[in-house]
Amino acid sequence: MHFTLQQLKLFEAVSRNNSYTRAAEELHLTQPAVSIQIKRLEEQCGLPIFESVSKKIFTTAAGKALYDASLDILNRAEELKNTIEELKGVVKGPLRLSVVTTSKYFMPHLLGTFLNQYPEVEPKMVFTNRARVIQRLYDNEDDFVVMGQTPEDDKLETYPFLENILVPVAHPDHPLAKKKKITLKELVKERFLVREEGSGTRLVFDRLLEKNEFKVEPYMELGSSEAIKQGVMAGLGLAILSLHSLRLEQDAKKLVVLDVEGFPIKRRWFAVHMKGKKLSLVAQTFHDFILAESNNILGFNKK
């Protein structure tokens, strides 16, 4: 059997999408061109690799075997390409990252500055919740991940690169907005909008309450910092948020940071990967870049 890498790429895309049309769109080809190559691939196999059921396509047993082999071959080909580029000393090729959602307020800025220096890097940055980032970390789906609350695991390498300051926020008209030296006991009497369980900010707040033997029943549980900010601006309650996420709202005077004992809580953002993982030249270069340049790029060294 003689397969080309292009045929295997087409086959992988059709299998993953269960659609000739979506695969063609993804690869910027016409559907007939994809169909012709898949037909040639089937001829090489001597067995059908797709079957149509109720106008939907599925891989056959032969197709599933070919799919597994295709992934391995394509991954090895990509690794070879990257190795050759690294031997040339060229910072070029894919960069795969997973980052927690709150980091969307600074990671795109860091990546954008990096890409200005290394325009041949091909980035893929997945924004998701902490639990999913951790899953991707252990499944080795990315070069490295970015999060605030790292798992306690000695199999991980963690590199702090940026301060993460957590603060209590309120609507400017809230009764506590102008009060000084608010006690934690006063604070916990208020309604709180919180992230889902397992998120970094939720973990920090829960630990603070536990340490001080307080309990807060969340008024609302929301899936993003943006949703929480909108809720606070609507007067639905208070929240604990990263200072990184508040620049626009503070400038517009739509949210205020409360003066509460025990705050701000100063944490760190971390670049994390499995211990012993060898980063590609692209990943290592970006890794070193954010560790060295984050504060300067984001203006946190300015007085």
Residue ranges and their predicted role:
Residues 2-3, 68, 109-113, 131-170, ...:
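Short beta-strand-centered segments that line the small-molecule binding cleft or hinge
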Residues 12-28:
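Short helix-boundary/capping micro-motifs
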Residues 31, 82, 88-118, 122-126, ...:
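N-terminal winged-helix
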Residues 42-61:
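A short LG(V/I)-centered, amphipathic sequence patch enriched
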Residues 88-89, 155-192:
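Flexible hinge/capping segments at coil-to-helix
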Residues 129-134, 138-141, 147-148, 206-256:
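Hydrophobic hinge/microswitch elements
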Residues 177, 191-212, 243, 279-283, ...:
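Secondary-structure junction motif
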Residues 256-300:
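A late-sequence structural motif
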